[in-house]
Swiss-Prot record:
InterPro entries: G_ERA_dom, GTP-bd, GTPase_Era-like, KH_dom-like_a/b, KH_dom_type_2, KH_sf_prok-type, P-loop_NTPase, Small_GTP-bd
Organism the protein comes from: Mus musculus (Mouse)
Stretches for region G4: 236-239
The entry's keywords: GTP-binding, Membrane, Mitochondrion, Mitochondrion inner membrane, Nucleotide-binding, Phosphoprotein, Ribosome biogenesis, RNA-binding, rRNA-binding, Transit peptide
G2, as annotated region: 146-150
GO biological process, one term: ribosomal small subunit assembly
Residues binding GTP, per UniProt: 120-127, 167-171, 236-239
Gene name for this UniProt entry: Eral1
Region (G3): 167-170
GO MF terms held by the record: GTP binding; ribosomal small subunit binding; rRNA binding
Identification of the protein by name: GTPase Era, mitochondrial
Residue ranges of domain KH type-2 in the record: 360-437
Family, per entry: Belongs to the TRAFAC class TrmE-Era-EngA-EngB-Septin-like GTPase superfamily. Era GTPase family.
Function recorded in the entry: Probable GTPase that plays a role in the mitochondrial ribosomal small subunit assembly. Specifically binds the 12S mitochondrial rRNA (12S mt-rRNA) to a 33 nucleotide section delineating the 3' terminal stem-loop region. May act as a chaperone that protects the 12S mt-rRNA on the 28S mitoribosomal subunit during ribosomal small subunit assembly.
């Protein structure tokens, strides 16, 4: 393959020297004027870089002025806890992140733990909900399907309780995976994650009138195969419904009129033929229906139902508190400073891909190859990143750059803002668009 031909790059200083506003528990960052260096895309030299890995015994707090879980492990003094956000930052160094993941959990005397699998059709809102539960946008989100390509893990730690979230790709059928040449992870990860689940959260997008009236067939298969795992139903995007009465009909259909072994008092007649049978909580259970029923549209073994908008903090907090109460006595799996199992480079690549899916039309974003060439600490302690975006067509180059370089600059700026919130440090990011010959 010939060497890629360099066209240009968007150069953005993402929120360098940003100021902090709002409460410490929920930080918000405002970019100072001029953080976007020019409207036109600028060419940059493509120097091959390497991942920077600072000394593990150097204080991350002194480098970036942030709380570091690694510092707590190594015994460095910490700032006043009242000045530290409740949600931990992710280290910008792969070695530090990996060390934290394998470190002995700093669990309390009576620890509690819960492993939660988020299950649903593509674009049901699983990653958005995961981000809201975690308090950080560590998982990629877009309106296009298959934004999440493989299983990702997030950790919520509050007091003596740890909740581990497994954000799975939208569940698909083997036929669709083969037809569209999708990764095996999209097919396998939702199923493998169920093997270690303590609770399943089934997410349904009620704004999609074409799919909302029945559970996804693959979701039903998964629930049936792992019927011993408790499950709850979450009706997402309820803010998009003009007629709230629709929620009653959907609840009746998706639960077959039964929640936690009790028949729902809903007058709307169920149209599913399988709804005529109402199992009792003691006489029957999920194992009685281990054989798949092709006519089934709902699952009568949900323990609870939640109706929410994943963008509404109050709604999400109600679900979060429920998850915390469902945790059972047991050892933690991770140190309290762990927010996600992803490496910092994976988070960055996913964030860039999220913006590509959001802003590029049709099939264009799916053909972009990403290659990180620089990941290092700058002279002022900022994180310096350069990623090359390789595209197969010259027309795609023009689309990605945008008029006068505005689109590539906007993408870089938004990615930088998100990364600054995740890493708690200043970010300088360069995106270089190249054509593959």
């Amino acid at each position: 393959m010939a060497a890629p031909r360099r066209y240009c790059a968007g150069l953005v200083r993402a929120l360098l020297g940003a100021r902090q506003v709002g409460s410490h528990a929920g930080r918000e960052w405002l970019a100072p004027p001029g953080c976007l260096l020019g409207n036109q895309a600028r060419c940059v030299s493509c120097v091959v870089g390497s991942t920077f890995s600072g000394p593990l015994l150097a204080s991350a707090s002194s480098r970036y002025g942030q709380d570091s879980a690694l510092d707590r492990i190594l015994g460095f003094s910490q700032p006043d806890s009242s000045l530290v956000p409740s949600v931990p930052a992710v280290s910008v160094h792969r070695d530090e992140q990996n060390l934290l993941l394998v470190h002995t959990p700093d669990m309390p005397e009576n620890p509690r733990v819960l492993r939660v699998v988020l299950l649903g059709a593509p674009n049901a809102g699983k990653s958005t909900l995961s981000n809201q539960l975690l308090g950080r946008k560590v998982f990629p989100v877009s309106k296009k399907v298959h934004t999440t390509r493989c299983q990702a893990l997030g950790v919520i730690t509050e007091k003596e309780t740890q909740v581990i979230l497994l954000d799975t790709p939208g569940i698909i059928s083997p036929v669709k995976q083969k037809r569209h040449h999708l990764e095996r992870s999209l097919l396998e990860d939702p199923w493998t994650s169920m093997e270690s689940a303590d609770l399943v959260v089934v997410l349904v997008d009620v704004s999609d009138k074409w799919t909302r009236s029945r559970l996804n067939p693959q979701v039903l298969q998964c629930l049936t195969k792992f019927s011993q795992v408790p499950s709850i139903l979450v009706l997402n995007k309820v803010d998009c419904l003009k007629q709230k009465s629709v929620l009653l009909e959907l609840t009746a259909a998706l639960t077959e009129g039964v929640v936690n072994g009790k028949k729902l008092n809903i007058k709307q007649a169920l149209r599913s033929r399988s709804s005529t049978h109402c199992p009792g909580p003691e006489t029957e259970g999920p194992n009685a229906h281990s054989v798949r029923n092709p006519q089934r549209i709902g699952w009568p073994y949900f323990q609870e139902i939640f109706m929410l908008s994943a963008l509404n903090n109050k709604d999400v907090n109600t679900l979060k508190q429920y998850l915390l109460t469902q945790a059972q006595p047991g050892p933690w799996e991770f140190h309290s400073g762990v927010l996600t199992s992803q490496t910092p480079e994976e988070i960055c690549a996913n964030k860039i891909r999220e913006k590509l899916l959001e802003y590029l039309p049709e099939e264009v974003p799916y053909g972009v190859q990403q290659k990180t060439v620089i990941w290092e600490e700058g002279p002022s302690g900022e994180l310096v990143i350069q990623q090359n975006l390789l595209v197969p067509k010259e027309s795609h180059v023009r689309i990605l750059i945008g008029q006068k370089g505005l689109l590539i600059s906007q993408i870089a700026q938004e990615v930088g803002r998100d990364l600054m919130d995740i890493f708690h440090c200043d970010v300088l990011i360069r995106l270089s668009v190249k054509l593959l010959k």
